[in-house]
A protein has these predicted regions:
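M16 family metallopeptidases and their MPP-like homologs
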Residues: 78, 83-109, 123-167, 197-224, ...
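An aromatic/glycine/proline-enriched structural segment found at the starts
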Residues: 48-50, 211, 219, 243, ...
Length: 499
C-alpha cells in the first residue's frame, strides 16, 4: 500500500501515528515560505549514531536495545511483556524519494512483489504461513522508506523472522506474476487517486510545490511510468537498495533481547553484505512567488488547500531551523490540534461560518523538504476565495497577536497523553522506532522531542507565524466541483489491494 505522510499525525500527538509522519493508504491533507529550507535526501542518517561493535546489544533508550550484525543490518528490540504477542518489522531506507524520473512508483511496486515468493516459496505463501501461525502481515511504502510487518503470537516469532529474512534475501518471481500484479497496482492508482478528486488535487499540488525534490512524484507513481515499467526494472531496484546495511529489523513485544539477537544472527545474519548506493543531493530551488492551480472534477463540494514550504527537523540539535520546525508543529496544534481549536471556532462554528471542515498540518520530519498545510471545505454559499482568506486570516492573527501560555499548555498536555496512549500498542512502538531509524533520529527521540516541544514559547510560535506564510512560498490548490451527472459509478476494489 502507498502511505503518504499525514502531517497532522506529527502535529497533534507528535508521534501518535508513528508517517508520516509517518510520509496506511494514501492519506493526504484534506491530507501527506519567506524563509525556506532546501533539503536533499539524507545520504547517511546513521552517521548521527555512535559506532557500535557488531553483534553486541546496547541499551540505547529506556527499554530499547540495538545491535548491528556483521553484514551491517540494524536490529532494534523493545520488550513489552504485557501480552503474549510480538511484532516484527523490516524497514528498508528506500522510498519514492530514491526513485529517478521515468521510474516513479517502483519502490511501491517492489513492495507488492516482495509478497510474490522466494526460491522456496510461491506467490502469497509467506502471508498464508503467517496466517496459519495466527498472525497478520502487510506492508507500506512512503516517500522516505518501505516497511513490512508481521504481528503474531510471541512463540511464532522464530518462524516469521525466518520467512521475512528469506523474502529479503531471496525474493524472486516470474515475469507473468509481475504483469498480473502491475494490473493490480494500476487499479489501485485508479481507485485511490484517479477516481478521488481530493487525492488528485493533493497529487497535483505536490507536483506544483516541488520542482526538483523527488517529493514532486507520487508514491504510487505516474500512470505513464507504470505503463513503461518492466519486471527487470523492479529486480534491479531491489538489487540496489535491499541490502543489509540499508535495512533495520524491529522486534517489539513479549520477547527477550538476547534471544532475538540470536534469531537475527541465524536468519538475517547469513545474508551477504553489499554496499548501499550513493544518493545524489536534489535540493529544492528557492520559490519566488505564489503558485496556483485548479482541478475541475465531479465533486459535491469545493476544497481549498494551501501549502507553505517550511524547515523540517534535521536531527535534535538546537538549531534555528529545528527550533522553527518545532514551533510550526505547535502552531499547527494551536490551529487544529483539538476539538474546537482556532480554525474550527473561527471558520466552522457560528451562523456566519465559512467552512464545513478545516485542517492544519505541519510536516515535522522527513528525508526531504517539508510543508505546512491549511485546508478548508467551503460551506454552502461560500466561495473558495473566502475560505482561503479566512484560513490565512487566522495565521495572520497569531502573527499579529500571538498565542497565550494557557493555550500552549493545553496542546502540550495532549501530546503527553498521546505518548502514553501510544505505548499501549506494541505495533505503534515498533513503527515509531523503525521510523526514527529510517529518518536518522536517535531511538530515544520521543522523550527528547517532547522535552523540546514543551519548551516552545509563545514568542517562538508567533515568530514562526510571521516568517513562513508569505505569498512567495505558497502553493494553492482549489478543487472546483463539476456536475456529478453522468459520473461513472465507483468500481469495487479488486482483489490484491491489501499491500
Amino acid at each position: 500500500m502507498t502511505f503518504t505522510p499525514s502531517l497532522r499525525a506529527a502535529a497533534v500527538a507528535l508521534l501518535l501515528a508513528g508517517g508520516a509522519v509517518l510520509h496506511g493508504c494514501a492519506s493526504h491533507p484534506e491530507t501527506s515560505q519567506t524563509a525556506q529550507t532546501a533539503q536533499a535526501p539524507q545520504a547517511a542518517p546513521d552517521a548521527q549514531q555512535p559506532p557500535q561493535p557488531p553483534n553486541v546489544l546496547a541499551q540505547v533508550a529506556a527499554g530499547v536495545y540495538q545491535a548491528r550484525l556483521d553484514n551491517g543490518l540494524t536490529l532494534i528490540v523493545k520488550p513489552d511483556r504485557r501480552s503474549p504477542v510480538a511484532v516484527q518489522m523490516l524497514w528498508v531506507r528506500v522510498g519514492s524519494i530514491d526513485e529517478v524520473d521515468g521510474a516513479s512508483g517502483i519502490a511501491h511496486m517492489l513492495e507488492h512483489m516482495m509478497f510474490k515468493g522466494t526460491k522456496q516459496l510461491g506467490p502469497g505463501e509467506i502471508s498464508r504461513r503467517v496466517a496459519l501461525l495466527g498472525g497478520r502481515d502487510n506492508a507500506f511504502t512512503t516517500s522516505d522508506y518501505t516497511a513490512y510487518f508481521q504481528q503474531v503470537p510471541a512463540a511464532a516469532l522464530p518462524q516469521v523472522m525466518a520467512l521475512q529474512a528469506d523474502s529479503f534475501e531471496n525474493n524472486q518471481w516470474p515475469d507473468d506474476e509481475f504483469t498480473r500484479e502491475m494490473a493490480v497496482v494500476k487499479e489501485e492508482r485508479r481507485l485511490r487517486t484517479d477516481d478521488q478528486p481530493r487525492a488528485r488535487l493533493y497529487e497535483q499540488q505536490m507536483a506544483a510545490a516541488f520542482v526538483a525534490s523527488p517529493y514532486h512524484r507520487p508514491v504510487i507513481g505516474w500512470m505513464g511510468d507504470l505503463d513503461s515499467m518492466t519486471a527487470d526494472d523492479v529486480r534491479a531496484f531491489r538489487q540496489s537498495w535491499y541490502v543489509p546495511a540499508n535495512a533495520a529489523v524491529v522486534v517489539a513485544g513479549d520477547v527477550d533481547p538476547a534471544a532475538v539477537l540470536a534469531l537475527a544472527q541465524k536468519t538475517y545474519g547469513r545474508i551477504p553484505a553489499r554496499a548501499v548506493p550513493g544518493r545524489k543531493p536534489r535540493p529544492e530551488p528557492q520559490q519566488h512567488g505564489p503558485r496556483r492551480l485548479e482541478l475541475r472534477a465531479p465533486a459535491e463540494q469545493a476544497v481549498v488547500s494551501l501549502v507553505f514550504k517550511v524547515p523540517g527537523l534535521q536531527g535534535l540539535a538546537a538549531t534555528p531551523e529545528n527550533d522553527d520546525a518545532l514551533a510550526l508543529t505547535v502552531l499547527a496544534a494551536v490551529l487544529d490540534g483539538y476539538q474546537g481549536a482556532r480554525l474550527e471556532r473561527a471558520l466552522v462554528q457560528g451562523k456566519d461560518r465559512v467552512a464545513d471542515s478545516v485542517n492544519a498540518d505541519n510536516g515535522l520530519m522527513g528525508r526531504g523538504p517539508q510543508l505546512f498545510s491549511l485546508l478548508a471545505v467551503p460551506a454552502k454559499g461560500r466561495t473558495p476565495a473566502q475560505a482561503e482568506a479566512a484560513l490565512r486570516a487566522e495565521v495572520a492573527r497569531i502573527a499579529r497577536e500571538g498565542v497565550g501560555q494557557a493555550e500552549l499548555e493545553r496542546v502540550k498536555t495532549q501530546w503527553i497523553a498521546g505518548q502514553v496512549y501510544k505505548r499501549d500498542s506494541v505495533m505503534a512502538q515498533a513503527q515509531e522506532l523503525g521510523s526514527y531509524w529510517a529518518l536518522g533520529l536517535p531511538l530515544d527521540a520521543d522523550e527528547k522531542l517532547i522535552k523540546r516541544l514543551r519548551a516552545v514559547t509563545p514568542a517562538q510560535v508567533q515568530a514562526a507565524a510571521r516568517k513562513y506564510f508569505g505569498d512567495e512560498q505558497m502553493t494553492a490548490a482549489t478543487l472546483v466541483p463539476q456536475s456529478l451527472k453522468n459520473r461513472p459509478r465507483p468500481r469495487p476494489a479488486p482483489a490484491g489491494l491489501r499491500h
